[in-house]
């Protein structure tokens, strides 16, 4: 099964060695792209509405010719949900998340709502702080 890494905005304090996992696709979600660069990982695509990405990070993304998908701030889905939607045949992939820690409560509820109500929950792992949270369908 192919492995997908999604890096969310918000804090990211995981010490998981991501270099030990072979990812076929790496997605930076808005400001979560910084967590990838901090770990010397280059995303294949960055998507979001630019509400949590600073100018220097955006310039770095552009200078590296990384595919960038820009969304309007006013939209019906969160950037995280759009990143999940971008995955072709998600039920056939292992999806790993980093970031999304702490922050505003509504963001955490949104993450939990998405991963427990969609087909992504079949094979989703969230490296949350020092924990590994597995989401699997029964």
Task: Locate the predicted segments by residue.
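Long, charged alpha-helical interface segments
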Residues: 131, 136-138
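A glycine-rich helix N-cap at a beta->alpha junction
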Residues: 64-72, 123-125
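Short glycine-rich or small-residue beta-strand-to-loop segments that form or flank ligand, phosphate
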Residues: 69, 95-100
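Basic phosphate/pyrophosphate-binding loop/patch that engages nucleotide-derived ligands
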Residues: 117-122
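Short Gly/Thr/Asp-enriched flexible loops that form oxyanion-binding sites at enzyme active sites
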Residues: 106-116
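Short phosphate-binding loop-to-helix
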Residues: 68-90
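N-terminal beta-strand-loop-alpha-helix module at the start
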Residues: 1-60
């Amino acid at each position: 099964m192919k492995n997908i890494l999604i890096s969310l905005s918000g804090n990211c304090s995981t010490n998981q060695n991501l270099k030990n996992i072979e990812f076929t696709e790496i997605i930076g979600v808005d400001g979560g792209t910084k967590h990838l660069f901090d770990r010397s990982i280059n995303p294949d695509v960055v998507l979001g509405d630019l509400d949590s990405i600073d100018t220097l990070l955006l310039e770095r993304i552009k200078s590296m010719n990384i595919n960038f998908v820009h969304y309007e701030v006013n939209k019906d889905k969160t950037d995280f949900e759009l990143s999940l939607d971008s995955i072709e045949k998600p039920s056939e992939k292992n999806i790993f998340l980093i970031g999304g820690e702490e922050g505003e409560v509504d963001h955490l509820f949104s993450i939990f709502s998405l991963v427990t109500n969609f087909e992504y929950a079949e094979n989703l792992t969230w490296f949350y702080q020092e924990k590994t949270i597995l989401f699997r369908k029964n």
